[in-house]
From Swiss-Prot:
A divalent metal cation binds at residues 102, 112, 146, 176. The lineage of its organism: Bacteria, Bacillati, Cyanobacteriota, Cyanophyceae, Synechococcales. It comes from Prochlorococcus marinus (strain MIT 9215). It catalyses: coproporphyrinogen III + O2 + 2 H(+) = protoporphyrinogen IX + 2 CO2 + 2 H2O. GO terms for biological process: chlorophyll biosynthetic process; protoporphyrinogen IX biosynthetic process. Substrate binds at residues 98, 114-116. Keywords: Chlorophyll biosynthesis, Cytoplasm, Heme biosynthesis, Metal-binding, Oxidoreductase, Porphyrin biosynthesis. Its cofactor is a divalent metal cation. This is Oxygen-dependent coproporphyrinogen-III oxidase. InterPro entries: Coprogen_oxidase_aer (IPR001260), Coprogen_oxidase_aer_sf (IPR036406), Coprogen_oxidase_CS (IPR018375). Involved in the heme and chlorophyll biosynthesis. Catalyzes the aerobic oxidative decarboxylation of propionate groups of rings A and B of coproporphyrinogen-III to yield the vinyl groups in protoporphyrinogen-IX. Signal peptide: none annotated. The gene is hemF.
Length: 342
């Protein structure tokens, strides 16, 4: 059922993800100018380890974390067995690079990235994605982020983005708030080149429908490796232009308070719903690295309601709902009319 990966699969993916960590850190340091990443290497008692890099109190980033890990073990956590029961009973290996950036300026969005690879006996798969969480809405920023990742997916297969975009909307959703964490991006998991592209749990959702409307996956290991490589390389051109455009925008305590309020939603998702956080904690991962995704400051306010017609209201009513960001002309017209396009 499962095609065997190449003999050097672990070393090859490890090197890809280490290189991605290096490139991202270099690009972020260059644009921040003031902040520098501090690296801390760590070893996991059960096998493997990683290197965590954190930048704090830069000119752009209040906190930025870019982590690499390579871990292995004998007993799979329940979060994996429930998704892939055929992997049970095998020793496992997992490697990944993850990143979360929390800028100071509320006009610069928070952003998350994660690319990973997993093996357990004959079972292997790739997963990953990137998603953007603005605090103040600008459609042009959203479009740049989505377009770069769409192009990266289409270098491998024209159908992938049709599934990965709604899958991202589905995954980064706060069920207890009935809202999206941000404006999405791409998300994929359990990709082994067989069966349907969509491997999530919502068979009635948009991602599942998109997957059913196209042919089953016929990608091999090398194709999926290239997908991770292309999408990883798409990150800096998807995000740095937003920083360049927004970093000089002035803001007041009002914008800062709203940013901290919306960061609270980020915390809620990561601690309640995120599978990566759950996997890390279930496998005795390094807690400091796992919780690196949390912002240094956040706030909660009972019964908050944004003023009607304000940028804050546009964010909560439109930019926390799945949209056709690239092609919806009515959305484009609305954003132009309300000065939230560019």
């Amino acid at each position: 059922m499962f095609k065997e990966p190449p003999k050097n699969s672990r070393e090859k993916t490890k090197n890809l993800l280490l290189t991605l960590q290096n490139k991202i850190c270099s690009g972020l340091e260059n644009i921040d100018e003031k902040g520098k990443f501090i690296e801390e290497s760590w070893i996991r008692d059960e096998g493997g380890g990683g290197r965590s890099r954190v930048l704090k109190n830069g000119s752009i980033f209040e906190q930025a974390g870019v982590n690499f890990s390579e871990v292995q073990g004998k007993e799979l956590p329940q979060s994996i067995v429930s998704q892939r029961p055929e992997a049970k009973g095998h020793e496992w290996f997992a490697t990944g690079t993850s990143m979360v950036l929390h800028p100071k300026n509320p006009y610069i969005p928070t952003v998350h990235l994660n690319y990973r690879y997993f093996e357990a006996g004959p079972v292997w798969w790739f997963g990953g994605g990137a998603d953007l969480t603005p605090f103040y809405p600008y459609l042009s920023d959203v479009r740049n982020f989505h377009n770069e990742h769409k192009k990266a997916c289409e270098k491998v297969d024209n159908d992938l983005h049709k599934v990965f975009k709604p899958w991202c909307d589905e995954y980064f959703f706060l069920k207890h708030r009935n809202e999206s964490r941000g404006i999405g991006g791409i998300f994929y998991d359990y990709q082994d080149g067989s069966g349907n592209i969509y491997r999530g749990n919502n068979q009635n959702g948009e991602a599942s429908k998109a997957s059913q409307s196209i042919s089953k996956s016929n990608l091999n290991w090398d194709n999926l490796f290239s997908l991770a490589e292309n999408c990883g390389q798409a990150f800096l051109p998807s995000y740095l232009p937003i920083i360049e455009k927004r970093a000089s925008q002035t803001y007041s305590s009002r914008e800062r308070e709203f940013q901290l309020y919306r960061r609270g939603r980020y915390v809620e998702f990561n601690l309640v719903w995120d599978r990566g956080t759950i996997f890390g904690l279930q496998t005795n991962g390094r807690t400091e690295s796992i919780l690196m995704s949390l912002p240094p400051l956040a706030r909660w306010e009972y019964g908050y309601k944004a003023k009607k017609g304000s940028r804050e209201e546009f964010l909560t009513s439109i930019f926390t709902k799945p949209q056709d960001w690239l092609d919806d002309k009515d959305l484009e017209k609305f954003c132009l009319e309300n000065n939230i396009f560019d």
